C-alpha cells in the first residue's frame, strides 16, 4: 500500500525527493546552482524534459536570486503568471510583481501602433522598470521586443523566456538567448516549444524561495 501524504509540506518534500531520484535514474546531472529552478519547473509540470531544455546564461540563477534579494520588480506577460507568483515571499524581500496586459494605456498603444498588447506591455516595462525581472510565459512577440530593447541598451536584471506554442516560439527563444549571451544579460530560456505561464511563475518562485531561504516548505508556513 502506498503511503498517504496529506499535508502540503510533506507532499512537496516527497515530490522533490522523487524528482531528485528520477533525475539520477535518467542520468541527468543538473549543476547545483541551477537545480532549484529545474526541479521547480519539473515539479510544476511533471515534465522531465525541462532538465535538458532549460538553458541558462552564466550566472543567471545567481543574478535572479540577487535581484530578488534587492527587492526586484517582476513583470509578467500574463495575469496567469502574475497570479502564480508567491506574493508573501516576494513581499518579504521588498519586491513586487506586475502585469501590464490589462492596462488601458497599453491597449491604446497597441491599437495605435498596430501591434500586440504583449509588445506594448514590454515596451512599457522597458521604459518604466528597466532593471526589472521580465518573465514571459506566453507571447513570443514579447521576447522579440525584449531582445530588440537589449540590443538598444536595456539591461534587465533577468529575462525568463518560456513561452509555449508552435508559431515563432522556438525562433524567438533562440534569438533572445543569443542576444542575452552576447550582451551579458542574465537569461533562463526553455528551448523548444514547451513552456507556459505556469513555468514562468515556477521559475520566479524558485528564485524567490532561494533568496528568502524558503526552499523547505515549512519555511513558508506550510504544515
Name these PLM-found stretches.
Residues 2-70:
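N-terminal nucleotide/polyanion-binding subdomain common to many enzyme families
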Residues 51-105:
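Active-site cofactor/substrate anionic-group-binding motifs, chiefly glycine-
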Residues 77, 159-161, 203:
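Buried hydrophobic positions in well-ordered alpha/beta secondary-structure cores of metabolic enzymes
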Residues 81-84, 140-146, 166-170, 196-200:
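Short glycine/serine/threonine-rich phosphate/pyrophosphate-binding segments
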Residues 90-129:
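Long, charge-dense
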Residues 128, 142-159, 163, 168-171, ...:
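Feature captures the catalytic cores and cofactor-binding loops of soluble hydro-lyases/lyases
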Residues 167-223:
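C-terminal functional extensions of proteins
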